[in-house]
Amino acid sequence: MSTAAPLEQETVPLSRTSAGREVPPARERARGWRSAEDPIIGWTGAVAVTLLAFFLRVWRLGTPHQFSFDETYYAKDAWSLLNNGYVRAYVDEADRTILNGQTTGLWKDEPSMIVHPEVGKWLIALGEKAFGMDPFGWRVAAAVVGSLMVLLMCRFVRRVTGSTALGLVGGLLLSFDGLHLVLSRLGLLDIFLAFFLLCGVHCIVADRAWFRDRLDRRTSASSSGWGARVLWRPWLVAAGVSFGLAIGTKWTALYPLAAFGVLVWLWSAGARRSHGVRWATAKSALLDGVPAFFSLVLVALVVYVASWGGWLAHAAEYEQSTLSDSQFTQYGGGKQWPTATEPDATGLGEVTQSLRSLAHYHHDVYMFHAHFLNDSTHIYASKPSGWLLMNRPVGVDAQLDIQPGTQGCEAPPGSNCLRQVLLLGNPILWWGGCLALLFAVAMWAGARDWRFGVAVVGVASTWLPWLLYDDRPIFIFYAICCLPFVVLAITLTMGKLIGSSRAPSPRRTAGVTVAGSFFVLVLVNFAWFWPIWTDVLLTHAEWVNRIWFKRWI
């Protein structure tokens, strides 16, 4: 009686590329390109790009010396959080009082009905704590976070592409965009939202490689038909923290959280399929989807609720305001919160009571966003369908009719000078990005290149939901959350144009020429629009040369 030799696990290539080369097995593909290029060079270059971005953002940061656009809400809310632990209503003429140097005695007794979460305002408060309640103080946090976002962009693109050079190009492109520059120089919330979203997506992309590596190490011939179990995924927990902070800045982060959560499941299923697991999509929904939900969504929920700590600690003030102040009931149909008339609880009951009050508060704020702005108008409102084409910028600040001989104006007789801060993206970057996104859709759908899918899903989840709300005043600078993924699409397209081979060839020469020319055009465009992004004095003729379309006025 003979005994058959034990079967050895055999690795079989899954398919062939369009060039006829065999696709490497899962074990080799899981290794990625972690050691492909020198990390010291990568980090040194990224830090250098970040320092350049910081210089551009902190230069004359305190001008204009006034509350610009919605800074009047967020900067003052942040100051109240810092001094009171929650947002209190301000006295009349508070803006003028603050700009005159008086920063105390500004508040009324009752809390204020704020309509955005508090994470971004706490970050603004850190700048005010460090540098004072003045324009530099309430803008410096945005400058720091905007610069850190450039660093994150360098590392994100490098992680996706495996190229240090493309990573640095991605960081520079982000740095040279007008929306990013201006929002990094204002005390608004959107730059913080974009930063945390990019951080969350970066962690999810890192989890993809980490999960495949762990799956490869643990999968063997003796594994069950489900494949190895990988329950602890630290990068997903980090992503959950980042998304929690993003939602704690603005609720719109819920859409990319949902979209990339689905992508996590599909990527996990694809990893299992590459190891021969049958019905991988269905099995992964249970084996990977459930743990990922806890790591990503529930962690985000915990972080989000914790970000309301100041509000929860002063829930009693809000509860009492529903009894005496109509601003807390107008959006909820005039109904008082049930917690307002309940006896004050203690211990765990007090926590529960405060959370219930927070839930009622969220209901009223949601009603405000969903219904009470529908009939409003704003001179700078724009349709989201045209955001990626830079259809309608936002005038943040303007000093018009500066006469010759004043403030350094050297306009010819009969003309004048002006200063302006315009929330407008770099047109060359965004228009080129639209073409790159079309290419990304083709590469994701046709070549099934997951990297292009990150760009497509990122733009879709941060842009398309706004089409549901185009009957209310919304603004082009909300597209700042799309920008990192537009830049990713551009850098991936550049990589395809240049090719992976370093050997000289006509194709590589043409690709480098096209990609390099585009980068130079973006840089030249950045220099050209710099004055209308940074409040620089211009003659009227110089200003007109930069306003390419009537709808930009």
Specify the residue positions occupied by each region the protein language model found.
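Short helix- or helix-capping micro-motifs
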Residues: 53, 170-175, 182, 243, ...
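Start-transfer (signal-anchor) and selected internal transmembrane alpha helices
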Residues: 1-56, 287-300, 505-515
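Aromatic-rich transmembrane-lumenal/periplasmic boundary elements in polytopic membrane proteins
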Residues: 61-99, 302-392, 538, 542-547
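Short acidic/glycine- and proline-prone juxtamembrane loop motifs at membrane-interface regions
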Residues: 67-68, 142, 182-192, 249-252
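Transmembrane-helix motifs of polytopic, lipid-linked glycan transferases
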Residues: 140-161, 199, 436-439
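Transmembrane helical bundles and short interhelical boundary loops of multi-pass, membrane-embedded
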Residues: 2-7, 227-235, 268-269, 279-282, ...
